[in-house]
């Protein structure tokens, strides 16, 4: 019996040693959903600082299918950090995990404002794999196109279709009006617009727009966090965290999967109910991990416009949809 026990211990130790040797022998690791830099560094017996150094990471942000170097030495300048050029003129850079507009600008001796202008960006959010122009002139697709000319209809007034990179102030300057006037014409109560949206730019406000949205916050007491976004890149949780930060109502980075957000938010002191407001978080437990969305607008007919990721498109792709009034109560709202 004693010999069998000793043999079993030796066998187990041998298996563990082989597994450890295989892990240590690996030079790269492909990130899996839910993994963190801590878990990966622990797996390969290296420090978080070493892992970040090997991969030129400036934050703890990683995303599924990203290939990380786990041994060897870091490259002072990787191929991806060198801008590519094309026949159309100008140079391009592919965004890496941990990049920011300011960091990219400093690499290529320009300003983040210039990169935003070159790429028609109207906010600071970029994502790994995104191709950004870092030198040259703004492409024609980012400049005014035929769609920048307002269309007219029999009901009076002119309309404009929002393009990527537009803002209310930019549109107003194109048509010799003010952003306040455009907001009034379209019944807008915030600055949020999205590509493909049709805006009235001249004429009179229609009755249907006079009360098209509500912004009543009902006096919610909202805690505010200033955490770093540690949610998995491209997921619904990642997007909603960023949108709340944009409006100055940052949330915790430790609520985990979407199906836990209502309970975690309640524990942190947030109000949870079934009444959507602009800026609130729509949450459901439906699905394996649940889902969260950001409420962009509450319409007069009871429907809501939401923005989300990883719902009707691949992770990292921002989409919008209108939730019908009869489905609004299917969600809980974090204020």
Curated annotation (Swiss-Prot):
Going by the UniProt record, its keywords in alphabetical order are:
Antimicrobial, Bacteriolytic enzyme, Cell cycle, Cell division, Cell wall biogenesis/degradation, Hydrolase, Repeat, Secreted, Septation, Signal, Virulence
Q: Which CDD domains match?
A: LysM
Predominant place of localization: secreted
**What's the Enzyme Commission number for this chain?**
3.5.1.28
Does Cell wall biogenesis/degradation appear among the keywords?
Answer: yes
Give GO MF terms, alphabetically: lytic endotransglycosylase activity; N-acetylmuramoyl-L-alanine amidase activity
- The record's region (Disordered) falls at 71-90
Q: Secretion signal: which residues? A: 1-25
Q: Which GO terms describe its cellular component?
A: cell surface; extracellular region
Q: Where does it reside?
A: Secreted; Cell surface
User: Which InterPro entries does its entry note?
Assistant: CHAP_dom (IPR007921), LysM_dom (IPR018392), LysM_dom_sf (IPR036779), Papain-like_cys_pep_sf (IPR038765)
Q: Where are the transmembrane segments?
A: none
Start-end of Low complexity biased regions: 71-86
Q: Where is the Peptidase C51 domain?
A: 211-335
Q: What does this protein do?
A: Peptidoglycan hydrolase involved in the splitting of the septum during cell division.
What name goes with this protein?
A: N-acetylmuramoyl-L-alanine amidase sle1
Q: Please name the source species.
A: Staphylococcus aureus (strain bovine RF122 / ET3-1)
Q: Which gene encodes it?
A: sle1
